[in-house]
């Protein structure tokens, strides 16, 4: 894939250091479950994996009603750190610098809404500055269901900082082509 990874006969010959960045415990829902499952699969294949999830995912003003959190204990088999604050630009810089210092081979980001673009874009741009880390995006939606005037510039900012994509549908693939020529 990116020089330090060789895939032969279904086995990885080099152990990768991977940071999964996105929803995970204590956040509820399918996105968190998917990210935890992906982390477990990479671990099963022998890679070193950490999940960086949110200290603040959405401000409570944007998440009225139900809780964002599950009421169960954290999984014992995953290293989950609550480090990302999506509404604090100083935090984005700190997380990006931390990743740049830690030099993971891959940061795998989950992207589903342009609301995350400023945060994820800043983190990705800073983390990639070490010349080692590659940012891969597992993307559910490019264009949100409810459109806002900032969607296109936010998407352009984040998607331009990504080295490769895993998309969830042909529609998303088509939408991605309007923003980037990165591998998909």
What are these regions (language model features)?
Residues 81-87, 94-118, 133-136:
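Short N-terminal targeting/anchoring amphipathic segment
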Residues 111, 141, 169-170:
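Helix N-cap/beta->alpha junction signal
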Residues 160-184:
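A short, active-site helix/loop in glycosyltransferases that binds the activated sugar's phosphate group
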């Amino acid at each position: 894939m990116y020089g330090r990874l060789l895939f032969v006969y279904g086995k990885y010959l080099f152990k990768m250091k991977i940071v999964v960045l996105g929803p995970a415990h204590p956040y509820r829902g399918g996105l968190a479950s998917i990210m935890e499952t992906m982390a477990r699969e990479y671990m099963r294949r022998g890679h070193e994996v950490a999940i960086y999830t949110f200290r603040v995912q959405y401000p409570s003003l944007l998440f009225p009603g139900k809780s964002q959190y599950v009421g169960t204990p954290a999984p014992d088999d995953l290293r989950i750190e609550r480090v990302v604050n999506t509404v604090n630009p100083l935090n984005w810089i700190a997380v990006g610098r931390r990743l740049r210092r830690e030099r993971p081979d891959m940061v795998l980001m989950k992207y589903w809404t342009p609301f995350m673009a400023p945060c994820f874009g800043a983190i990705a741009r800073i983390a990639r500055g070490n010349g080692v880390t590659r940012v891969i995006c597992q993307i559910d939606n490019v264009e949100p269901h409810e459109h806002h005037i900032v969607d296109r510039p936010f998407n352009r900012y984040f998607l331009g900082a990504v080295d490769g994509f895993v998309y969830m549908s042909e529609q998303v693939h088509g939408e991605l082509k309007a923003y980037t020529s990165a591998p998909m």
